[in-house]
């Protein structure tokens, strides 16, 4: 199962085992998104209504309306204010790295003079604005441990953005 095929805005592949005693009448869910179905929910679709932030900034008001099915779902019942939308504060060198990268690029695409010397291929990597996110990990806001750099704002993801990419409604506390 890949969560992106069911309207979740991230690639998240998992194996699901169903154990049943007796009759085998379990009906597996049918994917709702993908080729020939609804389009995948992209990063832009999922977080495009949130205010732009710089490193260390926060915001409490939505920047746009809930203009798609996903946003109407996550914003239902949330009111007028957005919570937990604060960007982690980063140092000047990391900010320069994040500003240099383009959509989908990683540390391997950086000039030698600012390229981190260690880390896996998907570290210090920028997400794609027009695609679903890669799988979220517990370090979803740490550029040195995952592909988590915001493609528009050149910063790490906020908690609200991480929650959105897991389809957690905005009113969840």
Regions found by a protein language model. Give the residues of each.
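Class I S-adenosyl-L-methionine
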Residues: 1-116
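C-terminal target-recognition/interaction regions appended to catalytic cores
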Residues: 65-173
């Amino acid at each position: 199962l890949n969560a992106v095929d069911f309207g979740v805005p991230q690639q998240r592949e998992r194996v699901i085992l169903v154990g049943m005693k007796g009759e085998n009448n379990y009906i597996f869910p049918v994917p709702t998104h993908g080729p020939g179905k609804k389009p995948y929910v992209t990063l832009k679709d999922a977080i495009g209504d949130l205010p732009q932030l710089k490193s260390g900034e926060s915001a409490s008001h939505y920047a746009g309306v809930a203009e798609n099915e996903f946003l109407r779902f996550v914003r239902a019942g949330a009111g007028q204010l957005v919570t937990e939308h604060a960007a982690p504060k980063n140092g000047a060198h990391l900010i320069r790295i994040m500003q240099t990268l383009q959509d989908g690029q990683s540390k391997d695409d950086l000039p030698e003079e600012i390229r981190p010397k260690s880390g896996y291929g998907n570290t210090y990597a920028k997400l794609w604005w027009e695609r679903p996110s890669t799988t979220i990990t517990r370090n979803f806001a740490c550029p040195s441990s995952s592909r988590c750099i915001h493609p528009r704002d050149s910063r790490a993801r906020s908690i609200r953005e991480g929650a959105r990419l897991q389809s957690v409604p905005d009113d969840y506390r």
